[in-house]
Amino acid sequence: MEAWDVIVLGDGPAALHAAAEAAKSGASTLMMSSTGLGAPGMAALDGLSASLQEANNRSHREDTIRCGAFLCDQDLVAETTAGAIKQVDLLERRGLNFRRDQQGLPIVRKGAGHQQPRTTDAGSATATGLQQIGEEQCMRHGVIRRGDQVPLTLVHTKQSVDGLVALDMVNGRIIGLQCKALIIADEGFEGAFHTGVVGLGMDMAFRAGVGLRDMEFITHHPLTVKGTNVFLPTGLMLDGATLHEASGAAIETDGRSMLDITASISAAVQPVLDARNMGQSAAWWGSLFRLVQQRTGIDMNRQTLPLEPAVGHTIGGLPVDGNGRCVVVRGPGGSPVFTPQATQPARGFTVPLRSAVTVCWTR
């Protein structure tokens, strides 16, 4: 039986950076993904939000709390927004090519739900850039990565994780893996609503006795290509793309939150996205335009694109504390009592470098 210090489930930025940090600290680390490596499903990533041109993070913190309907853990929001600038700087030094202004600083724009310009990106290369940087850090620190490994059962005794049983889809074998700590950082259950990836780590932990929380909270992504599972970043609208009815009537988006934009598109008879007048900014979205043309045959440089809102992210999941630990305390009669400070999905992050976005059982 293989024995590891840390096993990480997932293959997105949260999983990659958690694995890299564990290996950097000297732990033998294994990353496992139930799908092929390098496909975290982040095509709709709009960019990273940080108070780069503000005196402090107060406005960012308040915008995040307001858009979360005051249901967020405000201490965690304050901590995350305060450290956002440092994380953007770290990504830049590691090679992420942000778009820049005339002063050489990353360009910030006013994204949906923000009162101030603070969203920076690299166009359609944002998601792939984050993935590549995470993979480079894993290679640098010696993390072993395996794809097509389906987690089946969590092995635990006396509320301590001992390892897991997984199905090796490459060789068709059932394997047992021993570990001292397990980090669950894979997808949510978005695939239950449309064709896509479903995170199996959450299901495995649930069957082991960990109750899930806030599963009723689901976000709908407004810019989904009708009849497909292709999600378009709302950053397109910051570069000049506009929303219309097929008849030409404009759908207002300025200063509105993502919920309001989604509601407007849902109420429209035949909403379309017009990206034909993006000018020089269209060059930053070249790979996205090619993807849409391959999937639908529509050239976004010449044609409008039909839209329909779809479930983009699931917010609920395993209950964790401020450090991302899944804490389970047994109450009277052996029933589980959870004492978390927050509930976060494995990939629900503003800046995707904090290991706190993962769920970790330790012994």
Task: Set out the residue ranges of the language-model regions.
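Short hydrophobic core segments
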Residues: I7-L9, G176-E187, V337-F338
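A conserved FAD-binding loop/helix module that cradles the flavin
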Residues: E190-M204, A208, S335, Q341-R363
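Glycine-rich active-site loop/strand segments that organize a redox cofactor
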Residues: S49-T80
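An anion/pyrophosphate-binding glycine-rich loop and adjacent beta-alpha core
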Residues: M204, V210-V311, C360-R363
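Conserved redox-cofactor binding core of oxidoreductases
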Residues: E92-R173, Q178-A181, A185, H221-T228, ...
